[in-house]
Amino acid sequence: MQSKGQEIFASDHILLTVESRLQLWKKNNACKRLWNMDPTLWKQKSEEDVELSNRLGWLNLPSLMQDYVNELKDFAEEVKKAFDNIVLLGMGGSSLAPEVFFKTFGKKTGYPALKVLDSTHPLSVRKILDNYNLSKTLFIVSSKSGGTTETMSFFYAFYNSLSMSGANPGDYFIAITDKGSSLEMLAQNKKFRKTFITPGEVGGRYSALTYFGLVPAVLIGADIDALLKNAEQIEKNSSKNTVISSSEGFRLGAFLGELNLIKKDKITFFVSSSISSFPSWIEQLVAESTGKEGKGIVPVILEPPGDVEVYGNDSFFIYYRLKNDDNTQFDSNIEKLINAGFPVVIIHLDDLYDLGKEIYKWEIATAMAGSVLEINPFDQPNVQLAKTLSNESMEEYKKTGILPLEKPAIIYENISLLGKFISSDIKKAFNEFVSQAVEGNYFAIQSFLPYSEDIDSSIDKLKMVLRNKFHLAVTSGYGPRFLHSTGQLHKGDGNKGLFIQFTSDAVNDLDVPDRGYSFGTLITAQALGDLKALRNNGRRVISFHLSGKLKDHIDYITSLLN
């Protein structure tokens, strides 16, 4: 099953079900119904009609946003004369596409570099305060609602620092937000340099081709015209009059959905090195869109290929192959997986700006996979609980000065273990927890820790030990970032995850100015809220609190599995 840029390898039975789904969509006019924003493409319940039909503004973005390219380029010329660095303050859909664009395209000569801040760990915030010349830094405050707790906490910290320096702080900020949001009002009151208003009918994870993605991209000198024109090719290939069987987006959506129906729901990405960050954006789109009502597709990203034997029957693979990259290792591994009978999609890219096509293709595919699964791919019904529980902890802190922390079940040196265990021995307790895993499950490592290469390396080792020992998919993410990406899947899927949470002491904490809390308090409350939310949803979860040398502790915990 092949097209010029996309090859699908699978059993005859799977390929037949995909073709049958495409024929059904043709018969039911699914393409026209998508463009007519017909909510019955996903749900028959009238109470969901507004939520569904009001979230399809992304369909015409590639053609629509080309009208704003010159305006954005003019603004980029203004910015590059005044600033050496850009720091984007945002979470989830507001931050993932900009991060992918910078890691993929880099910065053009003469343009500022981009840093995405999406960690509330005080060490992550301090790194910017200590290492950046704030007078040469432009801050992008990026939030659809304008009320994202993490984003606004970042804003207060940097606005306060600039105010204390004697500068006119508003000159160092721009906002990207929805019309009528509290952030739009704040930007007016604080006299931000500029505010970009995005269409409200585009959900956060579908917003890569709105100002949320395009403004940061143009400010680093990326060719947003090429990005949009490439995306427009898929838009035209998925329009009302499209022959569905010729649309790569519809075909990929049918493939994702049909595999999920036969319990193949773990999707591992192998990606040429030059575009290695792209699956981080896909991860949120797929996980948050499909992980609900006991269903879901689990993306597995940023891991090296393993032997064929370490993958379960629930696995399938997407291979992004960029022309002229060194793809030798991936080519060999993918051939072995195909020969072993695993479903595989190979997507061929000619250059980096083909990402524009792929962004739009995945939006179409994810929406249509939602149609197969009969879910609403545009809501996130289970996200609010963790926020509510976190806010309750924060309110308790503001009243008493103390967070309602749980008493550890086991303490071993500088490692505290939370949960209920038969054994009081840390090794036995951890192995007792992981032994609950059965075929079709996955592990999710959730690290409310500061970013560092050392910690990344240790978490990667833990992932590989778990994968190779249990032959199950293993995902990982930093908190609170993952709460805005895979958090919905964790609480909304069919209870297939086993969750390993890491937290740490708030060393060298930092107050959020005039808010009555610190970044250390905030990230601790967020970890506590997610722990409670997972438990309230009947999830299997273990939490390690680490003091001192984080890398050494994670390595020790990994050794407990040997």
Kindly give the residue locations of the regions a language model identified.
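Glycine-rich phosphate-binding loops that contact phosphosugars or nucleotide phosphates
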Residues: D74-T242, F316, Y320-D325, D331-N339, ...
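Structural beta-sheet core signal
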Residues: L88, F139-V141, A175, T268-F269, ...
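Extended, charge-enriched "interface" segments that sit outside catalytic cores
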Residues: M1-E77, N324, S332, I346, ...
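Conserved, well-ordered active-site substructure
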Residues: P480-G516
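Active-site phosphate/pyrophosphate-binding segments
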Residues: S161-F316, N327, K361-A473, H484
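Anionic-ligand anchoring segments at beta-strand to alpha-helix junctions in alpha/beta enzyme folds, i.e.
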Residues: A82-K136, T268-E309, N468-G477
